[in-house]
Amino acid sequence: MPPPAEVTDPSHAPAVLRQLNEQRLRGLFCDVTLIAGDTKFPAHRSVLAASSPFFREALLASAPLPLPPVTGGSAPSPATTTAASSSSSPPPPASPHSSSPPRVLELPGVPAAAFSDVLNFIYSARLALPGGGGDGAAVAEIGALGRRLGISRLQGLGEGGDTWVPPAPSSMVTSEPNEDSLGPGLRTDGGWEGDKAEPLTPDSQPRRPFPCPRCGKSFIHPKRLQTHEAQCRRGSNTRGSAGLGPGGSGPGGPAGVDASALPQPVSFRDGPEHVVKVVGGHVLYVCAACERSYVTLSSLKRHSNVHSWRRKYPCRYCEKVFALAEYRTKHEVWHTGERRYQCIFCWETFVTYYNLKTHQRAFHGISPGLLASEKTPNGGYKPKLNTLKLYRLLPMRAAKRPYKTYSQGAPEAPLSPSLHTPVPAVMPASPQPLLPSVPEPGPPHSVITFAHPAPSVIVHGSSSSGAAGGGPVGTGGSQAASVITYTTPPRPPKKREYPPPPPEPAATPTSPASTAVIPATAAGPATATEEAKGRNLRAGRTLTYTAKPVGGVSGSGGSPTGTGRGSSQLQAPPPLCQITVRIGEEAIVKRRISETDLRPGELSGEEVEESEEEEEEEEEEDQEDQEESKAGGEDQLWRPYYSYKPKRKAGATASGLSGLPRGRRPPRWRQKLERRGWEETPAVEGPGGRGRGERRHRCGDCAQAFATLRKLRKHQEAHSGGSHNSRTGRRSSTRFTCPHCAKVCKTAAALNRHGQRHAVERPGGTPTPVIAYSKGSIGTRPTDVKEEAPQEMQVSSSSGEAGGGSAAAAAAEASESASLQDPVISGGEEPPVAGGGGYVYPPVQEFPLALIGGSRDPGAGKGKPGNEGPVGASEGNRMEEMGTAKVTFYPEPYPLVYGPQLLAAYPYNFSNLAALPVALNMVLPDEKGGGALPFLPGVFGYAVNPQTAPPTPPTPPPPLPLPVPPKGVGEMTGVERTQKGDVG
């Protein structure tokens, strides 16, 4: 019989070994995981068992079906294995991915760098000695590991040639992998959690074609491999830190290295391996390895796993192993690309918290101070008491199911919101649109919570559009994202709404419609009424400090269709709730914010939030529309530490409400009556409704028409300006109107400067200025001078309002004919006739009048009054040369002296001295620097009117003793004067 023919291939064995090594580097068909140090090495059982008797004995101890012993030894005892539960599992099939979970073998005390070189030698039959063989410590370390594993070719490396004794299988720690050590989302039965078992192709595994020849790590890009090789060469010099000396036969040398000679890991479970310290009354537990302090002992024990070799949290996508689960979670995010940090303003998601913080600072104007933290005694950080959590941490999806890209399609069943697993705001775009499930509307929330289905941290009440199902898919339309605003009272809702949406396809994320903001309102009867009418609230009516939306907020995968609405209609973006924040103490949730709530004296939002008050707010909308069009459509950035609201003038309030105190509001019946009073003259509307520029409000005094009610009220304030009683101690709110061109000036000085222009234009020149004191109780003003009420210039508060108990005030109160009104400077008419029943208002005074002044001697000492008295004509010449623009106010208080010398300087018949203490402290600076001097008689050369003043100076009444008060704060009780700010 001829011998059988044979076909031999000498290159078959190297080719198979080469393919096995490539599969190992790619992670294909690997059924065992070796952990050395902090690195995970995937490998094949058959290759390890064929190359090392150590691995053969260790793998036989945990094999599913025990094999008969090869050398006649007894089978390992079941007590020595920790994988008894896997003995009943069926053998692995021939598929690329076996149904049984891979084994995990931990090699305590084995350095990762040396084991990587040994594993590369097992799969490639080649070994690159560190440093070209010159690094004796590294070569000796590899030789010691080769003798420990029983690899004959590596036993001769280094000094000594001790024979290898296979250790007992119990010395190797084998563990059944739990959920943390499985593959990406693998269960014990071989399927995915929450999904059917899906066979994965080799393309789904990460491809790493560039392995490191020293440690076996593989890289995607060759540049990263070059960088790693440079670090790997430098790290090879420090491999002798495992307790191996440079030479010798002692316990520290490589000759006597065995399992007992290698350094044992530090155990934190056998005894207290920490130091207790007391710092400032706080007990701190300090780690003995890294000296990191912790407040509780449980935190230290949890931290101790970092320093031990028990690294039981391997990465599901690479070879790294972590001591704590959160370390692995943060690391796996870079593999999966999950965006877990979600912005509560625009629902944008980010991979890291730092990217989120940068986004909020750049796009939403969030102050970094709100997100700051404070140091704790143990060296960590804790949030401040008033720190706001402006992000939401989404659950990690890859931990429960394999990571899918959005191109793989949507799940079969529609996703419905759950109380424990929130649905992300941005859904994957699929060819088949999802049908959102509409849950039952729950009760409105007005609390701050951190666990709810909406993609927001702070919960607010349901809005009209959100309750109708206009929200994004997964939110249920019941809740919305959050906006931070200030603590202010609510404001009534407006009647103006969004225009009806056109039946066009949804707008792009960059269109203005997708970036509109709908203010949230409480779900109640008023909201239900608006929904029945098919209306949406108008954005921008409530001036809230909202965050700018970045991109399309409503750009979800499914079509946001609501109940009772067609799918083709353009839905408004999901509403943003409003959160008021009181910095420093607490966060308060409000339903409505208004720009006029910060202005006292106007309507209360709580009183007029009902639906019946909505009809009464329509007349102010045209004016506000014009203001909004001028200001632009940009949202104001949120700055919690700054106020965007300027204080409103006291005279800007409504004339009907000015009589009430500032802090109180009129009753509701009065508000309705006043509003209806403004609407007594209805405008004629055209077929298309009244236009924006139509004037339908007319003044009852001058019949001038105005387009808005607000302008009419401001105009009527000019008619009755300064006639109402202002609060004691507050600055007067009088506005000064020019009698020639009806220009309204805020201050008397501005009115005087404006009046000089008319004085130049008039041919008659400047009229003779006259001082007159109005008398409120005796007589009324003639009808021919009815329009001169705004021309009055209120100089200061009357002496009766001071309440200081001065003698002049007491004399004024005792006299019935005393004038309790403010002195008025005016001119243009004849002085009052003697014996008349009332005062006739004189013409307007064109120049500032300084009644009394005091000079100061610089050498007489500080604060001492100088010589008071009239100034001669020389001062008047100086005034005419300098002009009225250089007249200044006297900066400091000084005493006023009244006597015959003072009264003789005035060409008027003063029958009452009650108003004399009120004066403008206007002085003329001295050219020589000797102080300020009064200039009244020299400036105004008044002609003596025979009807008003006698030829001789009148006999003044007995002078009132006025003691000079001491100079101090709050002690000017007997003397009144008007400061500079009181004129305006």
From Swiss-Prot:
Phosphoserine carried by residues: S367
Superkingdom per UniProt: Eukaryota
Biased composition (Low complexity): 74-88, 478-488, 507-529, 807-819
Biased composition (Basic and acidic residues): 628-637
Modification after translation, per record: Phosphorylated by HIPK2. This phosphorylation reduces stability and triggers ZBTB4 protein degradation in response to DNA damage.
The keyword Zinc appears for this protein: yes
Renumbered residue ranges of the record's region Disordered: 71-104, 172-210, 227-262, 461-575, 593-696, 713-734, 756-836, 853-876, 947-984
BP terms from Gene Ontology: DNA damage response; negative regulation of DNA-templated transcription; negative regulation of transcription by RNA polymerase II; regulation of DNA-templated transcription
UniProt-recorded name of the protein: Zinc finger and BTB domain-containing protein 4
Pfam families xrefs: BTB (PF00651), zf-C2H2 (PF00096)
Positions bearing the Glycyl lysine isopeptide (Lys-Gly) (interchain with G-Cter in SUMO2) cross-link: K40, K548, K590
Domain BTB span(s) in chain numbering: 30-131
Ranges of compositional bias, category Acidic residues: 604-627
GO cellular component, one term: chromosome
Keywords: Chromosome, Coiled coil, DNA-binding, Isopeptide bond, Metal-binding, Nucleus, Phosphoprotein, Repeat, Repressor, Transcription, Transcription regulation, Ubl conjugation, Zinc, Zinc-finger
Gene3D superfamilies tied to this protein: Classic Zinc Finger, Potassium Channel Kv1.1, Chain A
Zinc finger residue extent: C2H2-type: 210-232, 285-307, 313-335, 341-364, 697-719, 736-758
